[in-house]
Amino acid sequence: MTMSDIEDSDVENYDIAGKLALRSDDELGSDDEQNTSGEEGEEVELQDEIVSSDDDDDDGDKGKDTGKMPPTKKAKLDRKPGSDFDFASLDFEAEDNEEEDKTLSSILALSNPTAKKAKAGSFASFGFSKFLLANIAKKGYKQPTPIQRRSIPLIIDNRDVVGMARTGSGKTAAFVLPLIEKLKLRSPSGVRAVILSPSRELALQTYKQVKEFSHGTNLQSIVLIGGDSLEEDFGKMMTKPDIIVCTPGRFLHLKVEMQYDLMSVQYIVFDEADRLFEMGFAEQLNELLLALPSNRQSLLFSATLPRSLVEFAKAGLTNPVLVRLDADSKLSENLQMAYFTTKRNEREANLLYILQEVIKMPLGTPEEVKKLAAMDKRSIESDEENEEAKEQNNGKKRKYKFKKERMPSAKELPSEKSTIIFVPTKHHVEYVTSLLKDAGYLVSYIYGTLDQHARKNQLYLFRIGLTKILVVTDVAARGIDIPVLANVINFTLPGSSKIFIHRVGRTARAGNKGWAYSIVNSSELPYLLDLEIFLGKKLLLTSMHEAKCELLKKKQGGSFIPPRINYTERLVVGAIPRLDLETFQELYENLLRNNYEIKVLKDVAAKGEKLYHRTRQPASQESLKRSKEILETNSWDDQHLLFGENLEKMKDDFLAKLQNRNVKETVFELKKKGVKENDSLAEFMHRRRRQLAPIQRKAQERKELLQKERLAGLSHGIEEEVLKIDGEASGYNQNVDEAELQETFELGDEAHNKKKTFKDPQFFMSHYAPASVIQDQQLSIASSFANDAQAATFDLDNDDKLQKNKQQVMKWDKKKGKYINSMSTDKKYIISENGTKIPATFRSGKFDEWRKQRNLKPTSSLTNNETPENNKRFKHKKQSVPKLPDKYRDDYHKQKQKVEKALDSGMRVKGYNKPGMQQELKSTEQIRKARAIKEQRRAKNARPSRRK
């Protein structure tokens, strides 16, 4: 069927979302910045992106369309049965990428004539305007990523979308590009788009992309983040911008403080949606959602979302479509991981060893240290001068322009060994930063409560490559704009598998390879086993690999080749070589001994870690049981396979052979060897050995039996693992076949009420629990975001780690004369528009004071229907009092005429009164003043009144 046949056919109602739902087996794209050019000013031609491939044909074929649309299967916009609020899901059929791109271009050409000549699979095939295509080309983007290719057409078609793709797949551009395409021009009606980001850094990063893609338009966009001046934000909001990029706390504060009307919002985006709904903003988010119009378009994007998204009905989605790209592959295929076991007090030594021996991190040269100190000093001085200028200029900041270093492009590493270290609390940030600086490394640091100016400065130093290491917490690292990294180090293993994905997702982007190193102790082993199930990647201990090699030796004989260790598909666990680790432990102890400040910071971090362990979510019971079994084998802390042969173990094996010799004697027996006389000590040792022999034999048999039971309980043994074909997935993932998909989902456009099966998903109990069920349990969102924050899937811990659930303690209140709950506060609440209680601190009256100082109308008088412009041209009608005439000036008579004219018009001029203008009757204020003056004169003169 040709394109002309399609246009002439009776079937004209093409569902864009339906036709785009084609399953492709291509790998996920890299991050937003993967295709950016090295220079911002580089000119890129648009011809390659817009011109159709038909233009390259021969002249004889021009005007002749010989291509046919590939046969496609209609997409299934499915709904889960048995749910009150159904979410549609895009069912991607297995098709080649080329066919999918051609189909996408053909379908969009039907709805948008500007996309008819667009090259298949390009940004122009979406029907974007010329200015937007030019901005995309300036950024260096050539082809859309999978999440962009599948979600942008749905967004343009005004569908609510829930997008799930891993970190760095281009989610930001997926909602920013259609947003700008739909808004295009400035509108005085008010705010039309709101983008909510969970962190300040992510908001700034999104705002930067909005500004770059909207270049050439008159769209006005602002960014609202915590830490900035409220007065500046008041001024921004009063300009009625088109696009607001903000963090939820500051935006809700301004909304309540200013009583701002949001009924003009057409487009709202929840970036990193899972985190937004788990930050404790339950009441405030409900208030915000109710303040938005019902016909808005809502979009949710995140790297990790559960398969069942019914709970996101709170966000007010209408007939949403789920676009999910990483249901099976949650990590980059280029990411290699290594897990190093540690003892209680050797975590810092492990960190120093990884940096120096594994990553080969260079120490800072004297020139680099001097340059870093100079830039820090310059930043502090400019900040102080900025504060002084702000006080002198009535709150206006003075911008200082310094010569900035060249930022690397998105494809370049900030530095060759750029490494980010994740720690649990802000106390650990200060401790680890001081430790590494004292060891000679160049370090930047960021945590949640750090000043905004300091954040930008620390991130800038890392981006330009002046510092090689960045120490962060999970809260602060969310959304930090670092396109490419070489290494990620987990100082402690996170308590959630989703947090781990967000951490390690910062490396191995844009087709680059990356490493993720994690330091794990025995208490964190259950979380590692949870991660094993969640990722679908099996644990690999050194003993397991050695047993595998022995089995292969028996099978292959002389042709044995040691198997290659796959650090991408397996979780390889082991310890750092003992002798080397002891050297770095001595180095750490010397640093601690010579620097009192580090010792103090270590004590503070230790207290914070105790509270962190007390409040983090527990591991699953199954993982706790398995961790005990692994710890009993005493093989989980063998030397890591990354370091080759274990010389210490070879020495121990040799000593064990000596210990298992046939003739065993003690020193008492050796002395009396060859002497026929009976010796009491030698006889005693013989008798003792005969008594212990049965006990030792039973203990050995018990150990072997436990080992057999453990191996029998595994899903597959070492033999099965060896016989596997190389490259085959060795995890717990189970591919869902087509029959199960058709049974689970329904067509989105049809309202089917009949059940597909007799099973009730709420009560049916299967005879087995597949691994996908465990994965969904870890990905699931609790029934209530507000009430079950503890059980939420992805709960990032605060930097200072305040305890969430403290026991209620009663204390005596002297003023009230009774015992009160120590947890109770006198926080005042106000009733919002929908009747919910919100903190009264949100309504402090600062905006009213700011407005009165500037003589501005209240926001209630600037509603959408009563805008100041009102689409009319204003005429200047203000009349001012003329200047008083001066005899000694040339314009005396002219000014006198102006005064007379003003008096005739009824205006009052000081010193000039016409008949009838002066008020004859005195006011009460004039009478009071006259009496006061009279009393003063009488007291001054002190003379009695004259009597006649």
Curated annotation (Swiss-Prot):
Q: Where is the composition biased (Polar residues)?
A: 856-868
| Any GO CC annotation of this UniProt entry | nucleolus
Compositionally biased, Basic residues: which spans?
A: 395-404, 939-948
Location in or out of the cell: Nucleus, Nucleolus
Coiled-coil region list? none
Keyword annotations: ATP-binding, Helicase, Hydrolase, Nucleotide-binding, Nucleus, Ribosome biogenesis, RNA-binding, rRNA processing
Region feature (Disordered): 1-80, 378-408, 849-948
- Under which name does UniProt file this protein? ATP-dependent RNA helicase DBP10
